[in-house]
Amino acid sequence: MEAEETMECLQEFPEHHKMILDRLNEQREQDRFTDITLIVDGHHFKAHKAVLAACSKFFYKFFQEFTQEPLVEIEGVSKMAFRHLIEFTYTAKLMIQGEEEANDVWKAAEFLQMLEAIKALEVRNKENSAPLEENTTGKNEAKKRKIAETSNVITESLPSAESEPVEIEVEIAEGTIEVEDEGIETLEEVASAKQSVKYIQSTGSSDDSALALLADITSKYRQGDRKGQIKEDGCPSDPTSKQVEGIEIVELQLSHVKDLFHCEKCNRSFKLFYHFKEHMKSHSTESFKCEICNKRYLRESAWKQHLNCYHLEEGGVSKKQRTGKKIHVCQYCEKQFDHFGHFKEHLRKHTGEKPFECPNCHERFARNSTLKCHLTACQTGVGAKKGRKKLYECQVCNSVFNSWDQFKDHLVIHTGDKPNHCTLCDLWFMQGNELRRHLSDAHNISERLVTEEVLSVETRVQTEPVTSMTIIEQVGKVHVLPLLQVQVDSAQVTVEQVHPDLLQDSQVHDSHMSELPEQVQVSYLEVGRIQTEEGTEVHVEELHVERVNQMPVEVQTELLEADLDHVTPEIMNQEERESSQADAAEAAREDHEDAEDLETKPTVDSEAEKAENEDRTALPVLE
């Protein structure tokens, strides 16, 4: 039973592989789940990284180093060849027409290290070349050629990181080369009588590319399947012997990687021709001299760096750098700029200027490029990018807001709700600004804090300075806040007598108080009415000043902090206010009557005294 179960588990289903490939190909064509875009000759190919890494060693190594690259541009491969390789990767089919097309696909497959594609091309070449070999075998064995070489040069162009051409010269010594017709095909491509042929291949820019290209040169002469092996000619009369000394030179360079470019003056070696060329400048007699301090430098880059670091303010800049360029120096951090636009953008970091404004949400930016990025998010309403404010879009009218409060107030228009409530008159409002306007107009309540200073009046009497106070009632509690003293217009008052309370509380201190005339006496200030409604400020509405004898005297009255402890606000209703006003009117009427009695009393007394004197004179004198 166990053996049968094992056999059942080992069953294979070849159709499953085909089904998986078909599904992956459909996803690629419909651009679903693709995670890489390959750009070849300006054409975009969508694919899956896992599939490419499974079929190509090149992509396997590349995706290990660069895991987050969404776009990859491939150079050195034609668009047609890459399309065939992509189709082969997802369908296992090759649809190639013509030998030229097959050669392009072969080169691309070798570059991308797609071994399965190379095997498929080898099978195709064998099938196409089999009938031709049967017909031409006899002729090829009889034909031989002789090629006379006179110092021909095979040059290989190597692309480097600095994008400068590097040439490797291989000298082929004079001699006679005898090669069979099968092996001469490759040699004819790279050598001809009294000419130098360049074989250019730009497949990469790394150090290993030099070895790969050199190996590609020699591989054309050492392929075993072509049977065109080249050997040194030990006997000149042997027709089957060959003599190519140049190939030995190439093999010698391949065995010494570090000796590709050798300096004969100091015995140093370099892998890249650019480094070798820069090194050779150190042996040259040319030098760059600083005209200010007479220092000499072998390299131009070192000379320019010296001028910029030490002699920039003294004008030590080369003529090439001085033509039409101005140096702009930041006055805040002393940073220097060649372009005025960069200098102006840098200044905005210090000044905080933001001249570019969004027409939709009125947000301002220091750079125009930042505004353009913001407009993309602001116009579409999909939300701003990293570092920018979040946007809120109304699903009803598509309006966009950059703050939650604005968005919430806008939604009320569509819902019809009135969440803003006035607790004084029980009215409801849709917008918050409508409620604030109602409180200001109907109830005389403003949102801002209105400070009321105790009015101060100047006097000739020396008094102690006191800070003005504002009393604010909030939630049934009274808070006294100190404020700066504010001088107001002086009041014209007459002073009748010095109030005794002021003297007792030490509010008035003057050594010359006794010198004041008796007619000049200090009056008092009377506060008319104080509003103490809950939730509002307490402020002075009226100021009454008594006038006696119409004598203009500047009086300054002050409240001391010690007296504020005795101030206790009383909440009065409307009836208490009316009764207090009636009592005040009654007291004023009684005072007026007393004043009239005082005026009439001296007249009555004088008449009674006169009558008494007359009576005394009328009486006879008794002896």
Swiss-Prot record:
A Pfam family: zf-met
Per the Swiss-Prot or TrEMBL record, what residue ranges does the short sequence motif Nuclear localization signal 2 cover?
A: 317-328
- Please tell me which stretches of this chain the record labels as motif Nuclear localization signal 1: 137-148
Cross-referenced SMART domains, in alphabetical order?
Answer: BTB (SM00225), ZnF_C2H2 (SM00355)
Q: Please indicate which superkingdom the organism of origin belongs to.
A: Eukaryota
Q: Where are the zinc fingers (C2H2-type)?
A: 261-283, 288-311, 328-350, 356-381, 392-414, 420-443
- Alphabetical list of PROSITE patterns matching this protein: BTB, ZINC_FINGER_C2H2_1, ZINC_FINGER_C2H2_2
Tissue specificity remark: Predominant expression is found in different brain areas such as the occipital and temporal lobe, the nucleus caudatus, hippocampus, and the cerebellum as well as in testis and thymus.
Where is region (Disordered) located? 573-623
Basic and acidic residues bias spans: 573-617
Chain ranges of the BTB domain: 34-98
State the InterPro entries in the record: BTB/POZ_dom, SKP1/BTB/POZ_sf, Znf_C2H2_sf, Znf_C2H2_type
The places in or outside the cell where this protein is found are: Nucleus
Substitution effect: residue 477 to R: Small loss of sumoylation. Complete loss of CBX4 sumoylation
Record's GO cellular component terms: intermediate filament cytoskeleton; nucleoplasm
UniProt keyword Zinc present: yes
Cross-link Glycyl lysine isopeptide (Lys-Gly) (interchain with G-Cter in SUMO2): which residues?
289, 295
PANTHER family, sorted: ZINC FINGER PROTEIN, ZINC FINGER PROTEIN 131
**Function of the protein:** Plays a role during development and organogenesis as well as in the function of the adult central nervous system. May be involved in transcriptional regulation as a repressor of ESR1/ER-alpha signaling.
| Membership in a protein family | Belongs to the krueppel C2H2-type zinc-finger protein family.
Q: What is this protein's record name?
A: Zinc finger protein 131
Give the gene name: ZNF131
